[in-house]
């Protein structure tokens, strides 16, 4: 007992994680490695700031700059045709979501019983019309591309060499000969 009194072990407060402040709790959790579950030996052994993790994981989370997203794979700037094709692809992919939203609005309209929602979304049975419009737009775009090709060839049909060959080796030969 005399040793206990000289070291004053009775007055030492034991650590209770429930009584810890939120900052101390966070600091206590941050000292453990998320992969191994072990405590860090040194606070300088690995980056604990969120900025370092963001820099490491930035591309995996899809954080790209606008300049990178506007460049094609080979680093070339995006042409107007490429931009339009991308927009057309986005319209095509969002068609299903648009139709679902329109369906939800028409069900709201039936519950509401007023004509205001019909004025917002247009004709109530136009879901098939919207998909038909997308198909018409694609057909018109292919016709416009054919017309541009005709203009480039001064009103003549495209030459036989521009037709797609049957085999890949013939296609590669055609490419090599055109250079």
Swiss-Prot record:
Segments of this protein annotated with the region Disordered: 1-79
Localization: Nucleus; Chromosome, Centromere; Chromosome, Centromere, Kinetochore
Location of the motif LXXLL motif: 172-176
Keyword terms of this UniProt record: Activator, Cell cycle, Cell division, Centromere, Chromosome, Kinetochore, Mitosis, Nucleus, Repressor, Transcription, Transcription regulation
Keyword Transcription regulation: yes
A GO CC term assigned to this protein in UniProt: nucleoplasm
Main localisation: nucleus
Gene Ontology terms describing biological process: cell division; CENP-A containing chromatin assembly; regulation of DNA-templated transcription
Biased composition (Basic and acidic residues): 51-64
Pfam families, per database record: CENP-R
Function, in words: Transcription coregulator that can have both coactivator and corepressor functions. Involved in the coactivation of nuclear receptors for retinoid X (RXRs) and thyroid hormone (TRs) in a ligand-dependent fashion. Probable component of a centromeric complex involved in assembly of kinetochore proteins, mitotic progression and chromosome segregation.
Protein name: Centromere protein R
Organism: Gallus gallus
Lineage: Eukaryota, Metazoa, Chordata, Craniata, Vertebrata
